[in-house]
Amino acid sequence: ESPLPKPVLDTNGKELNPNSSYRIISIGRGALGGDVYLGKSPNSDAPCPDGVFRYNSDVGPSGTPVRFIPLSGGIFEDQLLNIQFNIATVKLCVSYTIWKVGNLNAYFRTMLLETGGTIGQADSSYFKIVKLSNFGYNLLYCPITPPFLCPFCRDDNFCAKVGVVIQNGKRRLALVNENPLDVLFQEV
């Protein structure tokens, strides 16, 4: 029988709550640090900020709060969920708070994380939170409906790690082969 699912914990050791907001903070300090935030994508014609970035250091501003939306129940390791920046916004921009993985970017040869997604739909972008062996978590992107256009989806569950590429001097979240982003979740 499968082991009981393990709840994902925040920086205070509390179980993540779907009704609460969290900052995604990186484990690294200094230049290796930096919270995740919602920002404007270069060259985007979207009417709202539509890029998922992280600040260049942990002394930078605080990140944009997110909420994690599981398909049902609580927030557990290795479970499909949607991610949404939990901020007040005008009606036009509501969908531009919901994370999704963009189309293949020819320059970066990977897919960048952006917003403009949907929640709980077949075509939504689903993520998983997986525990690192010692401390902290990684985010994975796990497409659930074909066609699986996902160059780095390699593991048993057909998921790809979320890491960072440098786009116009900013750190943009993207699917990566190596060096995934090691993160913690800090309740807001």
Swiss-Prot record:
Pfam families: Kunitz_legume
One Gene Ontology CC term in the entry: vacuole
Main location (coarse class): other
TM spans (from-to): none
Classification via PROSITE patterns: SOYBEAN_KUNITZ (PS00283)
InterPro entries from the UniProt entry: Kunitz_inhibitor_STI-like_sf, Prot_inh_Kunz-lg
Disulfide-bonded cysteines: 48-93, 142-159, 150-153
Site residues (Reactive bond for chymotrypsin), renumbered to this chain: 111-112
Site residues, Reactive bond for trypsin: 67-68
Molecular function terms from GO: aspartic-type endopeptidase inhibitor activity; serine-type endopeptidase inhibitor activity
Keywords (A to Z) from UniProt: Allergen, Aspartic protease inhibitor, Disulfide bond, Glycoprotein, Protease inhibitor, Serine protease inhibitor, Vacuole
Localisation: Vacuole
Record's keyword annotation contains Glycoprotein: yes
Record has Glycoprotein as a keyword: yes
SUPFAM superfamilies: STI-like (SSF50386)
Record: glycosylation sites: 19
PANTHER family: KUNITZ TRYPSIN INHIBITOR 2, SERINE PROTEASE INHIBITOR 5
Family that this chain belongs to: Belongs to the protease inhibitor I3 (leguminous Kunitz-type inhibitor) family.
Function: Inhibitor of cathepsin D (aspartic protease) and trypsin (serine protease). May protect the plant by inhibiting proteases of invading organisms.
Protein name: Aspartic protease inhibitor 11
